C-alpha cells in the first residue's frame, strides 16, 4: 500500500435524504414513523446508503440517546447529532463517538467532521467486524433493498438484471444485529416502483438475481404500508406478513 500526499477538493454530493421531492414525502414520512416504532431509545444504529433510509431517519426526532456504528456517515446523521437525537452516550464501546469507515455528503458535513472529537473514522476491519458490531448496545441495522421475496430474502444489489450496487457491509451488520439480544435487523424499501407498475415485494426473484441477505437475517421489513415482523415465523406466516406490507394493488 502507498499513501500519496496531495491537495484536492473534497468529493461532495447532495446527501441522500436532503433532496426530497413533494411526491415522495408521504412515503418517507410513513416509513419514518414505522422505523420510529422499531428503534428504541439508546439504540446504536447502522444506516445503509440510499435516499430512502436517510430521508426516513428525519422522523426519528423524538428518540433519545441514539448511537452510531455504521459504514457510511452522511448529512442526516450530522443533523440528528446536532438536534440531540444522537448522543452516543449509551454505546457499549467507543462511547461518546460516532464510528464509521467512510463519509458521503456535502461540504458542510466535511467541515463539521473536521477536528470533531465526537466522531471516529476507522478501518473496515475494525468497524465491519461482526463481533465488534454485536457488542454494541441495542444494535439496530437499517438497510435498504431493491426487492424482497415472500420468504423474506432481500436483493440489495441487482436492478433490472444488472449490478446496481455492491453489498458492502450489509451482511456483517445484519448478522451482528440479529445476534444482539436487544438488536434488530431491519430492511427498508418502498412497496412499489416509482412508475407504479411493479411491486417490490415479489413472490420470488427472477433467475440470476443475487440474494444479498438470506431470510434468516431479515427480521423486519418496513414499507410505507407497514411493518412485517418475520422473527420466529414459518414460511407461510412470513409470506402473509410480507403480503400485508405490499402495495394494495399487488396483494391478490
Where in the sequence are the language-model features?
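Conserved phosphate- and dinucleotide-binding cores of soluble alpha/beta proteins
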Residues: 1-252
Amino acid at each position: 500500500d502507498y499513501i500519496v500526499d496531495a491537495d484536492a477538493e473534497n468529493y461532495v454530493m447532495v446527501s441522500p435524504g436532503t433532496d426530497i421531492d413533494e411526491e415522495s414525502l408521504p412515503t418517507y414520512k410513513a416509513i419514518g414513523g414505522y422505523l420510529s416504532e422499531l428503534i428504541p431509545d439508546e439504540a446504536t444504529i447502522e444506516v445503509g446508503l440510499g435516499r430512502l433510509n436517510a430521508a426516513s431517519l428525519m422522523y426519528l426526532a423524538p428518540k433519545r440517546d441514539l448511537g452510531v456504528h455504521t459504514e457510511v456517515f452522511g448529512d442526516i446523521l450530522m443533523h440528528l447529532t446536532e438536534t440531540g437525537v444522537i448522543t452516543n452516550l449509551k454505546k457499549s464501546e467507543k462511547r461518546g463517538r460516532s464510528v464509521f469507515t467512510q463519509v458521503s455528503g456535502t461540504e458542510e458535513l466535511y467541515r463539521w467532521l473536521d477536528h470533531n472529537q465526537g466522531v471516529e473514522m476507522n478501518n473496515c476491519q475494525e468497524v465491519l467486524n461482526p463481533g465488534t458490531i454485536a457488542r454494541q448496545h441495542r444494535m439496530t441495522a437499517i438497510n435498504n433493498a431493491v426487492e424482497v421475496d415472500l420468504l423474506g430474502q432481500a436483493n440489495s444489489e441487482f436492478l433490472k438484471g444488472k449490478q446496481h450496487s455492491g453489498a458492502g457491509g450489509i451482511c456483517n451488520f445484519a448478522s451482528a444485529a440479529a445476534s444482539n439480544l436487544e438488536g434488530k435487523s431491519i430492511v427498508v424499501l418502498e412497496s412499489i416502483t416509482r412508475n407504479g407498475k411493479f411491486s417490490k415485494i415479489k413472490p420470488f426473484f427472477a433467475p440470476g438475481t443475487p440474494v444479498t441477505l438470506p431470510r434468516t437475517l431479515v427480521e423486519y421489513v418496513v414499507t410505507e404500508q407497514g411493518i412485517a415482523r418475520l422473527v420466529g415465523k414459518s414460511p407461510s406466516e412470513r409470506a402473509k406478513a410480507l403480503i400485508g406490507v405490499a402495495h394494495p394493488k399487488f396483494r391478490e
